[in-house]
């Protein structure tokens, strides 16, 4: 015997059939990732203008699942990360050396132990000054 579904039973049946499959879930993050600087070290011109030379340690690039970027960079004498717009907040933290940070036309000197918190929408950059390389940590959300 064939029974036709009509009304609410038909609507319930069609709704159940039309429910999309759940989206695939990303792989779970591991308990931790340990990264050696030497494994992520690259000598290259700095970003945003390629002014001079630098050493970059793209620490967070070695992490499979991440919520922010964490990089160490040494700007060699005379080099700079050129002025560029940012679409996220960003932090420059100086480990050693001296530099001048730029944000929307304002400039400030940074030395070891100082940080610049830079806001979304700003035009930012930093240049090395002084006799030693400017070594800094740069942190920001991914995709920036």
List PLM regions with ranges:
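Bacterial N-terminal signal peptides
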Residues: 5-16
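Short acidic-glycine-tyrosine-enriched beta hairpin
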Residues: 106-121
């Amino acid at each position: 015997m064939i029974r036709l579904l009509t009304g609410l039973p038909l609507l319930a049946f069609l709704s159940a059939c039309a429910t999309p499959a759940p989206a695939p879930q990303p792989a779970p993050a591991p308990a931790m990732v340990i990264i050696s600087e030497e494994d992520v070290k690259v000598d290259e011109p700095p970003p945003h203008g390629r002014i001079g030379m630098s050493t970059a340690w793209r620490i967070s690039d070695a992490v499979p699942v991440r919520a922010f970027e964490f990089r160490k960079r040494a700007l060699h004498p005379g080099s700079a990360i050129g002025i560029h717009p940012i679409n996220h907040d960003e932090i420059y933290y100086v480990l050693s050396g001296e530099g001048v940070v730029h944000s929307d036309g304002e400039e400030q000197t940074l030395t070891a132990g100082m940080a610049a918190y830079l806001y979304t929408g700003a035009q930012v950059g930093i240049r090395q000054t002084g006799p030693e390389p400017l070594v800094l940590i740069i942190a920001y959300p991914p995709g920036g």
